[in-house]
């Protein structure tokens, strides 16, 4: 049969159901017609000629099983109905196998979409870590940024160079503007929402309950991503405070030593 998409499988199933209904209608018409012929009363002249005849032999068998009527397998109408019934049975078997294939294909696509969603979240997280790097601009970081790709923002895309270079403040540290950060969160949430919708097969689900379920899954995914990002951000802030504190202490000691040397020099100069 080859590779088929879920939409194609559903279209084939609908065609099978339509053919099944039409076959059932034809079988019903044949059965009904044959039954009416089998129970049709004989004319009065035949009854007068053979008033004591065997009624069982005069009765014509019908296809629909009725108590008191036998089925004649040699009747062409019966053979036609049986042939249609065999075709309908084979069609039902094809329907069962196609539904099984549809179920397996749906599960595989769902698992694939979930894996893609996790991969996309990991890519976004790696790009965030590279963009938030504080310190020297290593060549390997630029190479990694180019490899990861750009992150969506309000201006459609933010290139790795823009994230790395233009976000530097005068002190030489990297910082992401609030607008870019908020836009990134919004777009990341929208991306997660779309992946969750496709992953769970809710493309055809409408209404409040379906949208609420998709929204809840997206929120959980974004909260997990935000928790990881927040913990890393707090750790970086602590390190920055520690480095600034160490710099102030070092600067204070150097200044105090210079002041003492200057005072001593002034005293010596005053002595003449």
From Swiss-Prot:
KW RNA-binding (keyword) present: no
Any Gene Ontology CC annotation: chloroplast outer membrane
Keywords: Chloroplast, Coiled coil, Membrane, Plastid, Plastid outer membrane, Transmembrane, Transmembrane helix
Induction: Induced by gibberellic acid (GA).
Cellular localization per UniProt: Plastid, Chloroplast outer membrane
Membrane-spanning ranges: 207-225
Chief place of localization: plastid
Expressing tissues: Expressed in young developing leaves, root tips, shoot apices, and flower buds (sepals, petals, stamens, and pistils), but not in developed tissues.
GO molecular function, one term: phosphatidylinositol-4-phosphate binding
Membrane topology: Single-pass membrane protein
Chloroplast intermembrane side: 226-272
Protein role: Component of the plastid division machinery. Required to mediate the dissociation of ARC5/DRP5B from plastid outer envelope membranes (OEMs) at the midplastid constriction site in the cytoplasm, thus triggering ARC5/DRP5B ring turnover at the chloroplast division site. Binding to phosphatidylinositol 4-phosphate (PI4P) modulates negatively chloroplast division.
Subunit comment: Interacts (via C-terminus) with CDP1/PARC6 (via C-terminus). Interacts with ARC5/DRP5B.
Name of the molecule in the record: Plastid division protein PDV1
Gene name of the encoded protein: PDV1
């Amino acid at each position: 049969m080859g590779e088929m998409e879920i939409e194609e499988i559903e279209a084939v199933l609908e065609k099978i159901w339509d053919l099944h209904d039409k076959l059932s209608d034809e079988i019903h018409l044949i059965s009904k017609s044959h039954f009416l012929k089998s129970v049709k009363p004989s004319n009065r002249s035949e009854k007068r000629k053979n008033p004591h005849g065997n009624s069982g032999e005069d009765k014509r068998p019908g296809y629909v099983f009725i108590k008191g009527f036998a089925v004649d397998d040699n009747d062409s109408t019966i053979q036609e109905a049986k042939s249609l019934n065999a075709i309908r049975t084979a069609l039902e078997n094809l329907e069962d196998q196609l539904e099984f294939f549809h179920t397996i294909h749906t599960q595989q696509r769902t698992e694939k979409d979930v894996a893609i969603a996790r991969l996309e979240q990991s890519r976004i997280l790696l790009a965030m870590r590279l963009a938030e790097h504080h310190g020297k601009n290593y060549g390997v970081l630029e190479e990694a940024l180019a490899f990861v790709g750009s992150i969506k923002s309000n201006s459609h895309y933010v290139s790795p160079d823009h994230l790395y270079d233009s976000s530097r403040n005068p002190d030489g540290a990297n910082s992401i503007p609030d607008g870019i950060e908020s836009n990134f969160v919004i777009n990341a949430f929208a991306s997660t929402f779309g992946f969750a919708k496709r992953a769970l097969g809710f493309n055809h689900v409408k209404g409040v309950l379906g949208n609420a379920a998709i929204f809840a899954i997206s929120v959980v995914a974004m909260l997990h991503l935000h928790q990881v990002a927040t913990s890393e951000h707090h750790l970086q802030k602590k390190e920055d405070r520690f480095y600034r504190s160490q710099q102030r202490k070092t600067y204070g000691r150097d200044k105090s030593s210079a002041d003492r040397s200057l005072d001593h020099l002034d005293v010596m100069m005053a002595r003449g």
